[in-house]
Structures are given as structure tokens and as C-alpha cells.
Amino acid sequence: MSETEAEASVIGIIELFHKYTGRDDMIDKPGLLKMLQDNFPNFLAACDKKGTDYLANVFEKKDKNRDKKIDFSEFLSLLGDIATDYHKQSHGAPACSEGDQ
């Protein structure tokens, strides 16, 4: 049986996470910032245009357990914020309307 579009999307998210993780299956701060710059340049540019430095403190906000690493659930929380912003854009909101989360 072939993958559905939703299944392929979830697998793609897992692959994206693994592309930037270390041996411990976690992403450090430089890795997270690189992942955002590599994969969400339009989102970051929109935030910069609004004067919001999204990269300045996103790591600290998402590292809920303060272990200086981003685990998969913290990564999903970050992607959820970005996806929510894109969803709001689909309803006419400006880009990076929630970029300072």
C-alpha cells in the first residue's frame, strides 16, 4: 500500500528533524538556527521585514526543559508555530503575525 499525502508529510517532518540532529537525536542551537534558515527563509525574511528577530530567542522559548537541546516534541512545537502562521496567512493575515512567539 502506498503512503497517503498526510503520511508522506509526517515522514518528511521526521526526516527534516533527523537531518539536523546529532547522535543523541536532538538538535543544538546552531543546528536549529541552520534548519530554520535553510528551510524557512521566506518566513524569516517576513519577520525581519516587520522588525521581529525571530531567531534571537526561538531556541530558548522552545527548549522547555532547559537542556540546551531541542527534542522531537519541542521541534514539533516550533513547526506548529510556523504552520499556524502560514495558516493565518491563508486567511489574509500578514506573514509573521505570530513570529515573536
Curated annotation (Swiss-Prot):
Residues bearing N-acetylserine are: 2
Q: Which residues bind Ca(2+)?
A: 63, 65, 67, 69, 74
Xref: CDD domains: S-100
* Residues that, per the record, bind Zn(2+): 18, 25, 87, 91
- Tell whether S-adenosyl-L-methionine is among the UniProt keywords: no
Residue intervals of the EF-hand domain: 8-42, 50-85
Q: Which UniProt keywords apply?
A: Acetylation, Calcium, Cytoplasm, Metal-binding, Repeat, Secreted, Zinc
Cellular component annotations (GO), alphabetically ordered? cytoplasm; extracellular region
Q: Which SMART domains match?
A: S_100
Q: Which GO terms describe its molecular function?
A: calcium ion binding; calcium-dependent protein binding; transition metal ion binding
Q: Name one Pfam family in it.
A: S_100
Q: What is its main location?
A: cytoplasm
Tell me the GO BP annotations in alphabetical order. endothelial cell migration
Q: Where in the cell is it found?
A: Cytoplasm; Secreted
The entry describes its oligomerization and partners as: Interacts with RANBP9.
User: What is the name of this protein?
Assistant: Protein S100-A7
**Biological source species:** Equus caballus
